[in-house]
Design a protein with these regions (language model features):
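Amphipathic alpha-helical segments
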Residues: 83-107
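Intrinsically disordered, low-complexity regions enriched in serine/threonine
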Residues: 1-55, 127-319
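Short, well-ordered loop/turn elements at secondary-structure boundaries
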Residues: 64, 117-118, 138
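Generic structural hydrophobic/aromatic packing signal, biased to beta-strands
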Residues: 69, 122-124, 144
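Short N-terminal secondary-structure initiator segments
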Residues: 1-12, 97, 108, 113-121
């Protein structure tokens, strides 16, 4: 089975997905680039093809409307894109955090590449942290990710990680998704993205105010079942009823005391606990071919969408 993860680096404890090279704290950006497998560039070349006929070998022709992107180190192709496609280099993802780590107190915690270099990301802790009742701690992060295969715009996203279980949840505030997305048809301006994202205490405080509200909202069994039905509705339309029932039963078991931190006062019998049962299922329990497939889904794919839906439905309970 080929792995999605090409290379990755992290500090502190082994990440929940169990992948990567461990670094010491406060390593320079240059060390991160090497250890995270991000010390290469994305190169461009014309799309070429061989014309052939029965009488000859033909000749090399080009297709001017598109270009091939490939790695500078291995020369492996990454994708074919239009000429309008604006490349974001691996170094730009890490450089985004240079002033944040050197001046603003951020600390890089993980960075790496997926799918042979098609997806690139870095995650840094902001230094913001909040505690709900029962000593339930969540820390604030900013995730920056991009893809050169057309599957992901360059995205800067506020993210929270609950310490007791390492569940990840994208921060969303009202009409704002807590994210800034830059299409590859436009150039990536790191400083403009930071200004638009509004890396500030108020964003984190507003999010944790919502989480506090969820932790104080007690839920009854029928409410929990209705919530899970709404969250998993699109998934349960596909596949067998048995698979749907197993998913719901697994998440309900996590909520009902079997999940990490499920017995904390903030989570036991509350909407916050119900939300975290879904995020734990996506991050840790949901079936995946490999841990790197799980990471890909939880941060960028179907799992991320499922967690977003779970948050939306949870907030309805306290609206």
């Amino acid at each position: 089975m080929a792995h999605l993860l090409e290379q990755m680096a992290y500090i502190g404890d082994v990440p929940w997905h169990g992948l990567g090279n461990q670094l010491s704290a406060n390593e320079p950006i240059e060390v991160w680039a090497q250890q995270a497998g991000m010390d290469w560039t994305i190169c461009e070349a014309p799309v070429s093809f061989m014309t052939q006929d029965a009488a000859s070998l033909g000749k090399i022709a080009t297709f001017p409307e598109n270009k091939v992107l490939f790695r500078s180190d291995t020369k492996m192709p990454l994708s074919v894109v239009s000429q309008r496609f604006q490349v974001v280099q691996p170094s730009e993802i890490l450089e985004f955090y240079r002033d944040l780590t050197e001046v603003s107190g951020f600390e890089l915690e993980t960075a790496g590449v997926l799918k042979g270099g098609r997806k690139i990301w870095a995650l840094a802790r902001t230094g913001q942290s909040s505690t709900l009742k029962g000593n339930d701690v969540s820390n604030g992060y900013v995730l920056l990710a991009t893809a050169c295969d057309g599957t992901l715009a360059t995205t800067a996203q506020f993210t929270s990680i609950r310490v007791v279980c390492n569940n990840t949840l994208a921060v969303a505030l009202g009409a704002s998704s807590g994210a800034v997305k830059v299409r590859h048809s436009t150039s990536f301006d790191a400083q403009a993205v930071k200004r638009q994202l509004g890396i500030s205490v108020s964003t984190w405080s507003s999010f944790m105010y919502q989480m506090k509200g969820l932790s104080e909202r007690k839920v009854k069994m029928h409410e929990a079942m209705n919530y899970l039905s709404r969250v998993f509705f699109d998934e349960t339309k596909v596949g067998s009823d048995n698979a749907s029932n197993r998913t719901t039963a697994k998440v309900m078991a996590l909520f009902d005391g079997h999940g990490r931190g499920a017995e904390l006062a903030s989570a036991k019998g509350t909407a916050f606990g119900l939300l975290n049962a879904v995020t734990e299922f996506v991050d840790h329990e949901r079936r995946a071919r490999t841990n790197d497939h799980r990471l890909e889904s939880a941060w960028f794919g179907q799992g991320a969408s499922l967690k977003e839906k779970a948050l939306e439905q949870a907030l309805v309970m306290i609206a």
